[in-house]
């Protein structure tokens, strides 16, 4: 089961397609996910922020794949404690235990994992239609992170400026 779910997990997006993760097996069910320091890109990701985002995408793909197999992925984030935000810790990002659980349902997103690709084309400068934004908002059910849309050009520019400044910090 671990190999099957990892086949989907490794399709997660990563900075410059570096796939900066390392996986180890412990016991029969545990997967230990860590950042592979040999794959970091200090020039454009000095504190590993993008590597950690990539690890999160890896875990999401793993979770979706586990559900498709009738397993629950019990994910323990930063089991050694939360890392210092200014460095890339050597401690594991997560311990994942795969538990057979026939009550879990296959998420329809699972079927899209192999379809994901990097779009390197220039973005169109059109706004997300209100109807599409409403459909996305209605389908979103992860309460820890808010989802919202804006057609306010000043707000969009302000958020874009903050994102650019975040790369300098």
Role assignments for model-derived ranges:
Residues 1-169:
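Acidic, surface-exposed loops and disordered segments
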